[in-house]
Amino acid sequence: MTKKLPDDFIFGGATAAYQAEGATQTDGKGRVAWDTYLEENYWYTAEPASDFYNRYPVDLELSERFGVNGIRISIAWSRIFPKGYGEVNQKGVEYYHNLFKECHKRHVEPFVTLHHFDTPEVLHKDGDFLNRKTIDYFVDYAEFCFKEFPEVKYWTTFNEIGPIGDGQYLVGKFPPGIKYDFEKVFQSHHNMMVAHARAVKLFKDENYKGEIGVVHALPTKYPYDPSNPEDVRAAELEDIIHNKFILDATYLGKYSRETMEGVQHILSVNGGQLEISDEDYKILDEAKDLNDFLGINYYMSDWMRGFEGESEITHNATGDKGGSKYQLKGVGQREFDVDVPRTDWDWMIYPQGLYDQIMRVVKDYPNYHKIYITENGLGYKDVFDEKEKTVHDDARIDYIKQHLSVIADAIADGANVKGYFLWSLMDVFSWSNGYEKRYGLFYVDFETQERFPKKSAYWYKELAESKEIK
């Protein structure tokens, strides 16, 4: 049976400043922690990435031609405030005005994120969001943007608060590269949620036009053996780290008893304590009903087993399938030997997980208002067909189709889902995989920066026109 998506559904493509723009030191942009981290640890940098800083008119023309009517863009904080505060870089401000103008000219609605993994280096060195001064600077930056860019109708404060804490302090694959520090993980989550709440409250108090929300990565966690209490507990604890703690802060304005019990257990085993003030709870509570929408980024699910032992994570950055290991002291271990297809990077392809996660939000957080799927897509070692100047990415089409199908099911079952943004619009730079891992509708030749629509782009165009998942 053919499934249909609503007539007002957004068929979007997603980007992020640092992964797309390039121009990392151009026109007064300040440094971010990633600049130094990549120079010191990797064989690639984010220069020139997809050169979106100069080529955005090309990408937006392609968007219009291929039926993409929404784009996720992030503003690079250090392009506006090179140090994160203080002096404004006027050239950066002009760039984003020009970019948003081009979006509207091409009938592509910009959904704009204020922070996508790129805290200015000056603030990052000073503790990033573990330092509460960064919260104040972020709110000042947010207020500047709300005032300066009234042409933006859809704002999100942060992209993926969970993976920031996880990447910086648990897995250690983001700067500053700290591993297994649960105190820092939860404190980062919490402080960023306070920053989010303050920005949302300010947006509403000052009556800015438009809508505001937040983008959370919500990977679904299942027990490997649902009849084994240890596996069930491991899935619950892993869910608290990645999903429940942050969702509670967003929509309950506090942390539920089960959430705090899980956090205290993890910290008692690993050491550390969480600092939360009454003022924090007050602002979380004041903001909990003010989010106009939730952005859900979903790529994969995980299966958890009970585990007694030390923390050890091996991150698969090469795309050699089977290279991953993930076990956390006091939490559990991920089981990769499950009967579910997975990518070369060991990401479990499980569309049902997206359905389950959407319906979990609907059930547990009824004040969610509406949902956009703000990222979903398939990372692949695309093979470019020189003769036909395209990529025959049938696996990507199949992946998108399966996930859109469960979105249609969730809508039919009462979820208010208003749009889908494919990660990514064009091929972009990947944080921990460089230029090997491609996601785009449009193939980018990173040598020449030419764009070539993939087979998936033609499929997406037909989908956007018919709204039918075929």
From Swiss-Prot:
Record: residues binding D-galactose 6-phosphate: Q19, H116, N159, E160, N297, S430, W431, K437, Y439
Catalytic activity: a 6-phospho-beta-D-galactoside + H2O = D-galactose 6-phosphate + an alcohol
One GO process term, biological-process aspect: lactose catabolic process via tagatose-6-phosphate
InterPro entries per record: 6P-beta-galactosidase, Glyco_hydro_1, Glyco_hydro_1_AS, Glyco_hydro_1_N_CS, Glycoside_hydrolase_SF
Pathway in which this enzyme or protein is active: Carbohydrate metabolism; lactose degradation; D-galactose 6-phosphate and beta-D-glucose from lactose 6-phosphate: step 1/1
Family annotation (PROSITE patterns): GLYCOSYL_HYDROL_F1_1, GLYCOSYL_HYDROL_F1_2
Active-site residues from the entry: E160 (proton donor), E375 (nucleophile)
GO cellular component terms, semicolon-separated: cytosol
Keywords: Glycosidase, Hydrolase
GO MF, one annotated term: beta-glucosidase activity
EC assignment: 3.2.1.85
Record flagged with keyword Ligase: no
Domain of life, per lineage: Bacteria
Similarity comment: Belongs to the glycosyl hydrolase 1 family.
Protein name: 6-phospho-beta-galactosidase
Organism: Staphylococcus epidermidis (strain ATCC 35984 / DSM 28319 / BCRC 17069 / CCUG 31568 / BM 3577 / RP62A)
Organism ancestry: Bacteria, Bacillati, Bacillota, Bacilli, Bacillales
